[in-house]
């Protein structure tokens, strides 16, 4: 089965993004960048490959859709509840993986500085939510989708997780990426994914601050128990909202066409292997 030109090309773009981000990290070690200069450089690293991928036509002349269209207002409760549940699941998954690796994920990554609150929000919350979703769900997922919906979801989510380049922060982005791709496809809009990503990053920033402030008091395990309870609550509310949307036919169903062949094409893609190599190099270097 011949692979679509756009799908094959899109497989290289996460590796291109990883290369740009590694280059930016290298520049940071040699040149002191202000937070706003870093913000602009990081935004450029995402915008450039997104625009290029958007302009590349497929074998049939069609281009990938960034899905800027608004989603149905009836889906707002579902988006809200599943975003909260997804953020908590990602936090719990990262915490569990960190325990297995003998690390304390949020305590080590807590870099909250009250004097730079707006810079922290821009760099840790707004920029990743908007730029990463436009690239991974708007461009990459849409391009890979031509080879099958499920392969596109799995491959774009795996690439999304590897871009974060940290074993302790791998499980959360993988699960979150699958949720964001699901929202993008079923609601045919990138905005629910951006909102869910904003919620996730906001929770990450809060937990980083809480870990740094209260970890010495020994309350972190109790916070995880509270997070687990809230996850179950929000998930139940989300599933109830989703059930109503399905009953009224207001949500798209996933297509299983070409699942096996799409996965084979994706996992033997040279672009995905290049990304995996860059990810392993970054992990070993760290």
Placement of each model-derived feature along the sequence:
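Transmembrane alpha-helical insertion/packing segments
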Residues: 1-38, 126-127, 132-135, 208-209, ...
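Interfacial transmembrane-helix boundary/kink motif in multi-pass membrane proteins
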Residues: 2-16, 60-91, 250-275
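Residue-level signature of transmembrane alpha-helical entry/exit and packing/kink sites
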Residues: 5-14, 34-42, 71-79, 116-121, ...
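Alpha-helical membrane-inserting segments
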Residues: 20-28, 48-56, 85, 89-97, ...
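Juxtamembrane helix-loop-helix connectors linking adjacent transmembrane helices
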Residues: 27-36, 62-134, 142, 281-286
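Membrane-water interface of transmembrane alpha-helices
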Residues: 47-60, 95, 232-249
């Amino acid at each position: 089965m011949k692979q679509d030109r756009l799908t094959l090309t899109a497989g290289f773009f996460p590796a291109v993004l990883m290369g740009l981000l590694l280059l930016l990290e290298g520049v940071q070690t040699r040149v002191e960048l202000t937070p706003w200069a870093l913000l602009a450089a990081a935004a450029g690293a995402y915008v450039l490959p997104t625009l290029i991928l958007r302009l590349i036509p497929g074998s049939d002349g069609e281009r990938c859709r960034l899905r800027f269209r608004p989603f149905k207002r009836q889906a707002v409760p579902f988006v809200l509840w599943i975003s909260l549940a997804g953020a908590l699941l990602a936090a719990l998954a990262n915490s569990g993986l960190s325990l297995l690796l003998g690390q304390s994920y949020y305590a080590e990554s807590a870099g909250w500085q009250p004097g730079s609150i707006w810079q922290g929000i821009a760099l840790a919350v707004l920029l990743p939510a908007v730029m990463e979703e436009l690239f991974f769900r708007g461009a990459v997922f849409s391009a890979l989708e031509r080879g099958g919906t499920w392969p596109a979801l799995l491959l774009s989510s795996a690439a999304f997780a590897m871009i974060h380049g940290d074993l302790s922060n791998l499980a959360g982005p993988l699960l979150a990426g699958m949720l964001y791709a699901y929202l993008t496809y079923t609601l045919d809009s990138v905005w629910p994914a951006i909102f869910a990503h904003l919620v996730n990053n906001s929770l990450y920033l809060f937990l980083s601050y809480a870990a740094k402030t209260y970890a010495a008091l020994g309350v972190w395990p109790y916070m995880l128990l509270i997070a687990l309870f809230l996850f179950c609550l929000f998930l139940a509310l989300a599933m109830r909202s989703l059930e109503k949307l399905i009953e009224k036919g207001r949500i798209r169903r996933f297509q299983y066409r070409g699942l096996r062949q799409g996965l084979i094409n994706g996992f033997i893609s040279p672009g995905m292997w290049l990304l995996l190599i860059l990810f392993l190099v970054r992990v070993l270097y760290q």
